[in-house]
Amino acid sequence: MKTYKQTIKRIQLLVTANLLFFVCAVNAQIVNAEPQLRWVDVKELCIEGKGWTDTKHFYDRFPAKAEGLIRKSVWDLSENSAGICVRFKTDATSISARWTLRNRKIALTNMAASGVSGLDLYVRFNGEWRWLGAARPDSVTNEKKLTAGMSQEVRECLLYLPLYNGIENLEIGIPLEAKCELPPLRPINMKPVVFYGTSIVQGGCASRPGMAYPAILCRRLDCTMINLGFSGNAICEPEIATLLAELDPAVYMLDPLPNMNSEMVKSRMPEFIEKLRTVHPKTPIILVENTEMGDAPVNPSRREGYSTSNAILRKIFEERVKAGDRNLFYIRGDKLLGTDGQGTVDRVHPSDLGFMRMADVMEPVLKRALRAGR
């Protein structure tokens, strides 16, 4: 009899335990259930960072007419969405994104997928842009949560697109009751800063799109940008100068030297600058020296190569200033990455630390150039 009662009691305890487990599991599912989202195509919001509207694909960086006029390698890179961003206003407590990439290669050997093909979200807080969240892709088509748990108040947000991949489509997901609207207008007289250069300008090898130096600078100065960085292909071709001259920027920043040998700098740079000056006689132009590579202190041959190119660029700058070009500015390269050799991932391409250091050196010069152009 005693054994029978003990058995019944054990069964009752097991049933109770299973019921409790079931109730807890259901409650957990209810608590953790994702809210239904409303998806907004970002084309309905404010797209910044595009220099031309007549592009072959919406998120391309060069106009459709450039295909066939420029080298194929440059055209292919122009399909990367570097520098393009979406600005919007929302009271959402969580923000998600779903996006489709154009290239299946979502990462590089020296650069993470989060920078190559990911999204990067900032929010304006107390008048400054602050990082809010990022989304790392797993495949060509992705759906990821950028941020959650925010208080419900209206905020201005800025979402950067991938640096080294193209975008087929992009949507922002917010809770059904939330708003997602056009942001406050930029000042009517604001013009973008146009950056032309190499993989470094394009953003290699930032951990996420917002850490490329053009993005850092334009957040700090609260201005718009057009990123025309082309990895391994910034060699100051006249066709590229013609395209750049079609734009109407506040400032041109030219940073192509890492892709050019000294003879190319000597023969091509003066003509490139002159093509811009012919169309924009007073627009400030900033010339940027090659950075000092990480192993330069113990590698004389490498140091000699970029030192020669820098000296030629300096001479071009001085000759133009002497001839009366008062809106030409210059950034030396020896301090751009710091002095400890810790600013790159592979001796050449900056890490996030390197990009922050570059922005620190460039910011005061860009400020002066922007003032000069007003």
Give the ranges of each region predicted by the language model.
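Oxyanion-hole/transition-state-stabilizing segment in secreted/luminal serine hydrolases
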Residues: C205, L217, A234-V279, N290-P297, ...
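Substrate-gating cap/lid alpha-helix
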Residues: M293-I331
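Short helix-loop-beta junction
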Residues: P214-N227, E318
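N-terminal secretory targeting modules
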Residues: K2-T3, T7-K9, L13-P192, K367-R374
